[in-house]
Amino acid sequence: FYGVEFDSEFTLASFGGGDLLAGIWGDYLRGELDSGDDVPRLPPMRLGARLAWATDNFELWTRVLDADEQDKPGANQEATDGYTKWDIGADYRLATASGDLNLFIAFNNVTDEEIRLSTSFLRDVAPEAGFSVEAGVRWMF
C-alpha cells in the first residue's frame, strides 16, 4: 500500500463580525496484492474544498468533494464512475451551563448526483443517497 493525504484550513478575511474560512483536502491510496492484482474496495483519488463564514456561535458553509473514477477495482469488482458532491449547511451553537446546544441544517448532495462508492459492498445494488435535508439538535456535554 502507498498513498498521500492532506488537509488545510485557513482564514481568508474577517468581516461582519466573523471570519471567511477556506479549506482544501484530498487523498490518494493505491494497493496491490502479492499476486499483483489490485486490492478491492479502495477509494479513488478525492479532492475537496470548503468555504465558510463563521462567528463564535454561527457558521454558514458549503463544501464540494470531487472523486475520480475507480478504474482499478480489484478482481471480481466493477469499476465505479467519478462524481462531484456538493453540500450546503448552517450551524448555530448556544452555550449553556451544562454544555453546548448545537442546531444544524445541511442540504446534502444538492445536485442529486448518483454516487456509487468503490468502498461499498452494496455499490452495484444501491447508490448513496441523492439530495437530502438533514436537520437536528446536538447537545455536547
Q: What feature does the model see in each segment?
A:
Residues N57-E59, Y83-D87, D100-N102, S132:
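Active-site lining segments that contact anionic ligands and/or coordinate catalytic metals
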Residues T62-V64, E78, A106:
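Low-complexity, intrinsically disordered short segments enriched for Gly/Pro and polybasic residues
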Residues F6-F10, A49-W53, I88-Y92, I105, ...:
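Residues on the lipid-exposed face of transmembrane beta-strands in outer-membrane beta-barrel proteins
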Residues F1-P73:
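Gram-negative outer-membrane beta-barrel transporters
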Residues P73-T80, D87-D91:
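Short, glycine/charged-rich beta-strand-loop motifs at protein surfaces that mediate ligand recognition
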Residues I24, D71, Y92-F141:
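C-terminal beta-signal and adjacent terminal beta-strands/loops
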Residues G18-L20, T80-D81, G99:
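Short glycine/proline-enriched turns and hinge-like loops at secondary-structure junctions
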